[in-house]
Amino acid sequence: LGISLLTTIAFFEINTINKQIKAEKNLIAASEKDLFLYRQMGASYLCIASKAEVDFKKGLGIASATFANVIIGKHGGAIKELGNQKLDQKKLYNAGTFQIVGSALNICPESIPKKIKNDYKKRLKELAKGSKK
């Protein structure tokens, strides 16, 4: 009985590991539609949190971390637009922060601190200049 139970447990663990490996191989890069959904969810969370008087930086941090975690968990950090390149947690967090603030400015501009608005606009101009080169 002990050996058959041990064999069953070992087989179950190997089977679980194989399923995880197969799942990782089947990850599909995040499309623009996926990114839009995750960005809008983050912005919605940020707006609701701000209106509930949650500290803005904490709310933005949670929204950005969730954005990054979903892309890593569901898409392995891959974004269709970038080809085979996979982004790490930090890059996705930073990209999410920028994109979530941009969307939140459209949804609830009154909830975004002035300094954050100004920083966003400045960074957007820098990116626009960089893309023209």
Where are each of the predicted segments found?
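Classical Sec-dependent N-terminal signal peptides that target proteins to the secretory pathway
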Residues: 1-19
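Short, flexible coil/linker segments at or flanking structured domains
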Residues: 2-5, 33-35, 96
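Acidic/proline-rich low-complexity IDRs
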Residues: 4-5, 26, 91, 104
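Generic intrinsically disordered, low-complexity segments enriched for polar/acidic and small residues
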Residues: 8-9, 35, 42, 64, ...
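Phenylalanine-focused residue identity feature
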Residues: 11-12, 36, 56, 67, ...
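Intrinsically disordered, low-complexity linker/tail regions enriched in Pro/Ser/Thr
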Residues: 14-33, 129-130
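Short N-proximal segments of mature Sec-exported proteins
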Residues: 24-84
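Compact alpha-helical subdomains of small soluble proteins
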Residues: 61-133
